[in-house]
Amino acid sequence: MLENLCTLPLSADLFTQVVHPSKPLLTVGLSNGRVETFRIPTNEDSDDDEDENSSITGGKGVIKSVWSTHRHKGSCRTLTYSTDGESLYSAGTDSIVKHFSPETGVVISKIGLPPVNSTSSQSDTPAILHTLSPQTLLLGTDSGSLYIFDLRENGSLNPKPVRKHVPHSDYISSLTPLPPSSESTSGFPKQWVSTGGATLAVTDLRHGIMATSEDQEDELLCSTVIPTGLGPKHMRNNAVLAVGTGGGVLTLWDRGAWDDQQERIYVAPGETKRDGESLDAIVRVPDELGWGKKAVVGVGDGTVKIVDLKRREVQTTFQHDEVEGVAALNFDYENRLISGGGRTVKVWAEAGSAQEDEEEEEEVVEADQGVKRPAGSDDSDDDDGSDSDSDRPKRERKKKRRKGNKKGKHGGPSVSFPGLD
């Protein structure tokens, strides 16, 4: 059973969110160009540990703002962490990529994107970022271009991309690295899958675009990889890619067979493709949770669906928002699910484990005073950029098709998972 631990209201529509790989930090990028980092309550935190920087939440914990700044003119489109969590990168509709500290928000380096093509003076517009390795940053754009940037020792950006590919004719909606081969010496991926428009493409760091799919006649909006356990017979260790579409269908692709999809799971279909709810976000369920081969999918009607990839069916559904679609999904380092969409972020965890954590916390008392130990948290200052709440550009929508205005069925604060309780 999943339980909503806390709810975070935002000052503008959420475009992107990321979580730190080893710390309880959540960073959001908003439609008004603001970027803000929050500290999520952990198992060691006290429910009474509140201060003036706390945000309104549920009864299980307090989310605190660590820093906030007006990072981009226009909207903040995308965020990504470095592989070690020491650096954060953002990109906005101002065609600028910024590198900054996750702890303080202070900018360390920044670059501008090159023109869309040789005949244009207009800069390309970023759509998505992904850190492939400690040395490589990928950036996909609205024009369908893919830029590869080298990263220096401290994570700083080199001003010029080392390579440029054009795998798609429409904006790049997702970037998913493929697991490295057994012969890999670095342990980091060298190939990745991108989606854009109605096609999927595979690109190699050294050799460029390796494969492009057939036209799928539906928008491909999000993707995640399942490294093992779902491949065809006699090839169970072959990776499988799950791709969410605009028509509410989750398609499965076997690694190496990139021409066309192999399986279809109807997650939020309609009577026709146009009636289906868009699948805008997806994340693989961590193996540590013991749920099996499952993925969590964020839907345009505001619902979140747990999909059993082996049984090819939706296992359960719960509600993130009554009106706005789910734009982002993550699991943090404590394997809690974080859903974001509209002007709300919610943190979810298994109800049983949350109750056990509370009981353990009650037992941790000072020997002399018999009181809970407070959990400390230091708030950091913003960088020197504009930080006025009045700086709010007009609301801007992503290019991807959205159906978030349709109301979904009401969902309670906790959700049962058959076979997972």
Swiss-Prot record:
Residues 395-410 have a biased composition (Basic residues). Residues 39-58, 351-421 are annotated as: Disordered. SUPFAM superfamilies: WD40 repeat-like (SSF50978). Pfam families: WD40 (PF00400). SMART domains: WD40. Its main location: nucleus. GO terms for cellular component: nucleolus. It is found in: Nucleus, Nucleolus. Keywords: Nucleus, Repeat, WD repeat. Residues 44-53, 355-366, 378-388 have a biased composition (Acidic residues). InterPro entries: WD40/YVTN_repeat-like_dom_sf, WD40_repeat_dom_sf, WD40_rpt, WDR55_POC1. It comes from the Eukaryota. Gene3D superfamilies: YVTN repeat-like/Quinoprotein amine dehydrogenase (2.130.10.10). WD repeats lie at residues 9-48, 71-110, 120-159, 220-263, 277-317, 321-358. Belongs to the WD repeat WDR55 family. This is WD repeat-containing protein jip5. It comes from Neurospora crassa (strain ATCC 24698 / 74-OR23-1A / CBS 708.71 / DSM 1257 / FGSC 987).
